[in-house]
């Protein structure tokens, strides 16, 4: 089973909310996806804006606890890939990601103006994959059960809320005593194989028609 990666490239601006410990962060950047419909970890042609906010609490001068919420979008379209153009599949999904974790800096920004850092944690995210039908109308894919989820053998209907493991790293700069700027690359290894609504195989068209109607077959 191929799991998905939710990749976020962030430019982060933390503002110190207190003189020593707590920082409020705001950030913007790009979100991307890797999975059954996209084998590259990052492709600018299918990247989307992402933004969010969070809190960073300094446990020590190098170790911090972080809590973020990120709003983004992931998608893939075979029309943009010469390799997969004949397959002609596509999807798009908004993603809301809430993450708790720890961040470790190699150096203290109280002593230096620059430090690399890494982070890891746990996140809970929501998604809702959709595609366009033959008339160009947006259709949400989960209710269609195109792989028989919910009615075929042991294929259970998947939840639109899942857990993931976030991890990554970046470089942080102390612009002043109260403002820090960070450039960060992060991934989310998801706990679902249905971020793009593709996992195993499609079921028989007649069986799909009987259970979910003509729209699912189309």
Regions found by a protein language model. Give the residues of each.
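Predominantly the C-terminal beta-signal and adjacent terminal strand-loop region
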Residues: 176-218
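Residues that define the transmembrane beta-barrel architecture of outer-membrane proteins
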Residues: 45-49, 94-98, 114, 161-165
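Extracellular loop and loop/strand-boundary signature of outer-membrane beta-barrel proteins
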Residues: 34-42, 83-91, 151-157
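Repeated loop/turn-to-beta-strand initiation elements of outer-membrane beta-barrel proteins
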Residues: 22, 62-65, 178-181
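Residues on the lipid-exposed face of transmembrane beta-strands in outer-membrane beta-barrel proteins
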Residues: 26, 53-57, 100-104, 120-122, ...
């Amino acid at each position: 089973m191929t799991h998905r990666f939710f990749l976020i490239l962030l430019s982060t601006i933390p503002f110190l909310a207190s003189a020593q410990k707590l920082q409020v962060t705001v950030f913007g950047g790009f979100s991307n996806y890797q999975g059954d419909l996209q084998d590259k970890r990052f492709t600018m042609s299918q990247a989307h804006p992402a933004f969010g906010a969070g809190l960073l609490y300094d446990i020590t001068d190098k170790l911090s606890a972080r809590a973020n919420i990120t709003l983004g979008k992931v998608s893939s379209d075979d029309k943009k890939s010469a390799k997969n153009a004949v397959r002609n599949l596509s999807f798009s999904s908004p993603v809301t990601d809430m993450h708790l974790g720890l961040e470790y800096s190699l150096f203290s920004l109280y002593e230096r103006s620059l430090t690399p850092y890494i982070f890891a944690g746990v996140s809970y995210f929501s998604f809702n994959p959709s595609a366009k039908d033959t008339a160009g109308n947006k259709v949400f894919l989960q209710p269609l059960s195109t792989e028989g989820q919910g009615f075929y053998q042991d294929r259970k209907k998947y939840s639109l809320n899942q857990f993931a493991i976030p991890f990554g790293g970046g470089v942080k700069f102390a612009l002043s005593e109260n403002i820090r700027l960070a450039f960060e690359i992060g991934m989310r290894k998801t706990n679902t194989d249905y971020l793009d609504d593709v996992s195993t195989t499609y079921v028989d068209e007649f069986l799909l028609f009987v259970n979910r109607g003509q729209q699912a077959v189309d």
